[in-house]
Structure formats: C-alpha cells, structure tokens
Amino acid sequence: MHSNRPKATSDTSTIVRLYGALLVIAITVGALVTAVALRDKEIQDWRHHLGSMSYMLTEHTAQTVFSAFLVLDAITEQVRQMDVQDEAAFRQRLSTVEMHQLLRDKIQGLSQLDVASIVAANGDNINFSRAHPVPRINLAERDYFKAHRDQPHLGDHISTAVRNKGNGKWTFYVSRRLDDAQGRFLGLVLVGLSVDAFTGVYGRLIETLGDGASISLYRGDLTMLARAPHQDDLIGRVNRSGTTHRVITEQGAQDAVVLTDTPRFSDGIGNLRLIAVRKAMRYPLVVSLVVPDTIFLASW
C-alpha cells in the first residue's frame, strides 16, 4: 500500500506559501492605504492652514486699502467745503501751498500710501503731497481718469497698477470724481498705494512658507496689482486662465482652497499645488496664495 504523506506535505507547504504571500500583500496594501490616508490628512491640514492664512491676509489687505479711502474721504470733504464751482476757481484754490501741506499731512505716517493728488478736468496734476509747486504732469491717459471723466456715476475707483510719473515706482490708486453743483466734471482726488508695501508684507510671509510659494493681489476683474515674488511682466495683466479665474469668475465663489495641477497663469506651467483664493468683503479685491507640493508634501 502506497503512503500519501509526501503529497500531504507538499500540499501543506503550498498552503503555507500562499498564506504567506497573502499576508505580505495584505501588509503592503495596508501600508499603502495608511500612507494614502496620511497623505490626504496632510493635504487637508494644509487646506485648513492656507484657508485661515488667506483670510488673515485678505483682511490685512483690506485694512491697508481702507486707510487710503479714509484719506480720500478727508481730502474730498475738505475740497467740498471750499464750494468751488468752476474750473478756474478749482485750479486757483486747490493748487496752493496750503493744500499741498494738507495733502502731506493726510498721508504722513502711513508708509503704505505713496502720494495724494488733485487732478484737474484736463488731466493736469495741479497739486500733490510730494512737492510744491507741482512738476508738470498730465494724467489724462490713465485708466482712472478716463473712467471718472466718462462715467459720472462711477463712484470710487481702484485703478490698475502703473509706474508713478513722480517717482517711477509701481503704484495703484483709489480715486473719486469731483463735480460742480450742476454735476459737471471738475477733476479728481487720488490716493496712491505703494505696490512695494504689499509685496513687502507678502514677501515676508512666503519666506516662512518656503521656495515656490507666491501671493498675488488682484483687482475685482483679476487685473494683477501686486505679487510676491514680484514680476514686472505680470503687473497689470488680467488673469483669464488660471485657477483664481475659475474660482472667482467661472464658479462665482467667495473663497476656496483648491488642489490642482493645471497650467499656472504666471508661466503656463502645470505643477501640483494648493491655491487659496479669497475675495475681500468691502472692496473689489482678490488675494491668491499658492503653495507647491514641494512644501505641503515635503515629508513625502
């Protein structure tokens, strides 16, 4: 009679090897699932962190712009109290050294404010905070001048960023139209905000985040006003293709934190990154904070 022991032993060995292989697979799958879960948690933690950071950053930006509007209010009220009713009187009374001193006093101690100006109906800068008498400067080609001249009921306006004609620095302006009693255009009051003031604050923040991070400030129509790191060729451009455009314009969201690898507005390159986008509550401004995966997945 033949013995079945060798076959039984062989079957047992096969089963042991099979169970061993299954155990290895189970451990590997478990490790992968755990790794994915931990990676997802890391991303979620960063989403929350960037959402909070974008809120604080947007509030700081709004407070900075608020200071410019306070100055705009004060200067406008001073001009209205003069009850100027024609262009000749406007030029005569608002071009004085006393008005120059008032403009200087209003922005003194506010380093984020670059200049305060009075502009006549033809675009001539008839007084400003930097010097008196004012050098010959005409601003008729600027977007804010055309907007107020052509739209009597525009209200307050935030301009695109331009090179200031007085000192050559990047500046954007809050402005208000001045009319006579009949509603005829007399001129403008301008308060200029230094782009450097924003890039300085933004730059210090991205230093704490790491290489590859960036912060952008846009006007409501997504015209770029400021960016850190600064790029001259991006200032004044309108974002019509990036994630910020999709969140704000296409989706109509107030804020969002998005994980994406679509091409960037800044250079067209697609890399994995988190983008925290937020609209300011009081002003037509949008802040966008970008962090690449080399930062938020640095431990992976």
Question: Model features per residue range: what roles?
Answer:
Residues 1-9, 47-49, 155-159:
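N-terminal sensory and localization modules of signal-transduction and trafficking proteins
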Residues 239-300:
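Extracellular/periplasmic juxtamembrane segments that couple receptor/chemosensory ectodomains to their
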Residues 8-10, 199-205, 291-300:
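Membrane-interface helix-start motif
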Residues 8-19, 23-89, 108-112:
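Juxtamembrane extracytoplasmic/periplasmic/luminal helical "stalk" adjacent to the first N-terminal
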Residues 43, 47, 51, 69, ...:
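Short, structured helix-loop boundary elements
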Residues 58, 62, 142-146, 192, ...:
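Amphipathic alpha-helical bundle/coiled-coil segments
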Residues 74-79, 96-130, 142, 146, ...:
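Extracytoplasmic ligand-binding sensor domains of the Cache superfamily
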Residues 107-114, 121-200, 204-211, 256, ...:
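Extracytoplasmic/periplasmic ligand-binding sensor regions of membrane-associated signaling proteins
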